[in-house]
Structure formats: C-alpha cells, structure tokens
C-alpha cells in the first residue's frame, strides 16, 4: 500500500482486478474491510459512452453503474487471500432500482457488502450514491472461478 489518503489507489486496484480502460470504473477505494468496500468512480464528460448516451443530455448508463458496483465487489472478493489472482463473475442481479440519473461531474460512491458467502458463491447488497443520495441499489449473486488465473 502506498502513502495515500485512499485505502487503494487506481494502480493498486489494477493489481487486483483485470479490468482496464475503457471498462475500468474504479478510480480509488476509500475503505475496505472483510465484507464491505466503499469505492469511488468519478464520472467525467471525457468518457467514451457520452458520445452516444445521450448527445445533448449525457447520462451514465444504468448498466455501467451496475458494472461499477460489480468491480468494487470484485476488488473486495479478490483481495481475500484464498482468491487472489482468481476471477470473480456476476452470477445474477436482483432488485435493481435506479432512483436518479448520473451525469458528468458526479462522484459516485460505490458500496458493496457481502451478506452470504459459501464456498465460491455469495450474495451481496450494493448501493451507488451521489452527494449522499442513493442513485442505484441491487443485490448481486457472485461466483469465484478458482480455476481461472488472471493474465498480468
């Protein structure tokens, strides 16, 4: 860990999960514990998605909010000693709700909390916030592929 005000920098995040530009949505991790993570995604107008979603009314797609939450969860899962270097996948998304749109300039706080973990399968509650307000909530089912090794 570097001398930083963050629990993990973007560089440290890239040592844990395989996502890279243009599909890397974690700028840094604010806090991480055994079963909970809080990460940050700075939404900027320079993101490729805003070229088409939507011209004149740029809106960060809901599916990418879910992907951002999933990436935060992957960090939490793959930081566990027994899963380091493995791959984590979404097995299901339930009860997804989108409460308000996310636009360029927003700072999304991504909270992912594991509620059940048995073997290599688990469940988690996830919430994205902007300015302290919930913008998206959902429940994830996740699976760790212990046979898969990340390419470095």
Predicted regions located by residue number:
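HotDog/MaoC-like acyl-thioester-processing domains
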Residues: 3-5, 36, 102-106, 113-152
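Catalytic strand-loop segment that frames the active site of acyl-thioester-processing enzymes
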Residues: 21-60
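Hydrophobic beta-strand-centered segment that forms part of the acyl-chain substrate-binding groove
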Residues: 2-7, 73-109, 135-143
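Active-site helix/loop of acyl-thioester processing domains in fatty-acid/polyketide metabolism
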Residues: 29, 60-83
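Short, hydrophobic/aromatic-enriched beta-strand segments in well-ordered soluble domains
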Residues: 41, 111-114
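Conserved positions in beta-strands of structured domains
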Residues: 27-30, 94, 99, 113-115
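N-terminal leader/capping segments at the start of a protein or of a new domain
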Residues: 1-26, 31
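Small/polar/charged residue-enriched interaction surfaces, especially the RNA/DNA-contacting tracks
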Residues: 6, 19, 39-42, 144
